[in-house]
Curated annotation (Swiss-Prot):
First-listed, main subcellular location of the protein, grouped into a coarse class: secreted
Subunit: Forms an apoplastic complex with host endoglucanases in tomato leaves during P.infestans infection.
Single GO biological process annotation from the record: proteolysis
Record key words, sorted: Disulfide bond, Glycoprotein, Secreted, Signal, Virulence
Leader peptide range in chain numbering: 1-21
List of glycosylated residues: N90, N105, N110, N160
Intrachain S-S bonds: C56-C72, C180-C192, C202-C235
Record's note on what induces expression: Expressed during infection and the expression levels increase with disease progression.
Protein name according to UniProt: Glucanase inhibitor protein 4
Phylogenetic classification of the source organism: Eukaryota, Sar, Stramenopiles, Oomycota, Peronosporales
Limits of the Peptidase S1 domain: 29-255
SUPFAM superfamilies: Trypsin-like serine proteases (SSF50494)
Length: 255
């Protein structure tokens, strides 16, 4: 498995034309509901086979790159395919299914602390769907108290639930790391968010996007976090930990 540094990770993100945020904010799994079909099409399902169940989520951040977390690239199942723009957990009847040609962990990833829990997938061909925007480097896109949305195909009930067949969304509030440190040990590569008891990420949501919505459509959505620690430990807790996309070192390129 290859790995990449903070600077080169950022270079990949911006060198391939990943969309960046141009700033203005809209106030959307467990405890949520199905999103309208044809929305959040930058959300990707990661699959072992072309038409099998998505076992992780991801975010299309350029036509040929998907951002996800480290647990999604071979620890349980091989990340052989991504399904982009699909509303459904499995099958090939909507969206597009594209083969993964390489997967890279961030070199800063620490399996003990969970720092830099980020991975990048490169696709065999460009996707026709619009990538999600990346956050600004000045911390202006992640503000404690702001509303955010989590989307994924994870369990909708726990512990005896099953994965959602349709893409789900739930609204969460971003917490300061100081407040969240009462529950978890955090660093600057993480962001904490929660929606109260019963509104959370769950099994199957790992790697999926935490979104800041800035308009009535999806074209200005920004991916600020990736489902990380919370979905691997328990479901339905008041707050969960996400990998912080702002911490990837984009500022080193003057973004």
């Amino acid at each position: 498995m290859k790995s990449i540094t903070t600077a080169s990770f950022a270079l990949i993100l911006f060198g391939v034309g990943a969309a960046s945020a141009d700033h203005a904010s809209r106030v959307l799994v467990l405890g949520g509901g199905a999103v309208p079909s044809g929305t959040k099409t930058y959300t990707t399902g990661i699959r072992a086979t072309i038409d099998g169940d998505s076992f992780c989520g991801g975010s299309l951040i350029s036509p040929t790159h998907v951002l996800t977390t480290t647990a999604c690239i071979g620890y349980t199942k091989p990340a052989n395919w991504v399904s982009v723009g699909t509303h459904y957990l499995n099958g090939t009847h909507d969206g597009e299914q594209i083969k993964v040609v390489s997967a890279q962990n961030h070199t800063g990833f620490n399996s003990t602390s969970g720092s830099y829990d980020v991975a990048l997938l490169r696709l065999e061909r460009p996707s026709k769907f619009m990538p999600v925007k990346l956050p600004a480097a000045d911390d202006s896109d992640v503000i404690p108290g702001m509303r955010s949305s989590l989307v994924g195909w994870g369990y909708t009930s726990y512990p005896n639930g099953t994965k959602a067949y349709e893409l789900q969304g739930v609204g969460l509030e971003v917490w300061s790391n100081t407040d969240c440190a009462r529950i978890y040990s955090l660093d600057d590569t993480m962001v904490c968010a929660g929606g109260g008891v019963g509104k959370d990420s769950c099994n199957g949501d790992t790697g999926g996007p935490l979104i800041k919505e800035r308009g009535p459509g999806d074209e200005d959505d920004i991916v600020v976090g990736l489902v990380s620690l919370g979905s691997r430990m328990w479901c339905g807790v008041p707050r969960s930990v996400f990998a912080c996309v702002e911490s990837l070192g984009m500022d080193q390129l003057g973004h």
